[in-house]
């Protein structure tokens, strides 16, 4: 009798599991889809954790209150220019989850996005960097990648874009990144980023 009861309970439990609809893994994101909006914001989908190159020469303040473009904070980076790892270049990848170089299934389907928009400013002006997304290869890899090309910052906030036309955005593991070479700023540099977002029309994630 007990075996029969256990069997009936097992059948009931299995029927409940089968009745739960499967999550649609093909669902696309809603836009604007923020990489960074404010330090600690729940709307941030990526984390500036992938320090690379001469990573020992990079300092970051993810909740900088020094004149953010919008909201309460921006993210501040300082690169001293020192060849701490002997490479003469440095950068930071915004990853999901933190420190994910393709070992964890953390990519987002951003199909439908038309461009990445973001605001940047330099502490002195004249700072030379390249901004990009994608580029992580591993057990889990980015489906695409693109770049802004070389950018020279000004002291005032300025909006920049990375076009996404013809990009495969079905799996975006690195939502954003910056890189620079020591030769571009031998004395180092400090710069600020804010309102980094994927958008799907002619508009953008502008400051409110």
Set out the residue ranges of the language-model regions.
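Beta-rich carbohydrate-recognition modules and glycan-binding surfaces
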Residues: 22-208
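Bacterial N-terminal signal peptides
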Residues: 8-17
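Bacterial N-terminal signal peptides that target proteins for export
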Residues: 1-9
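Sequence-pattern detector for short linear motifs
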Residues: 5-6, 19, 124
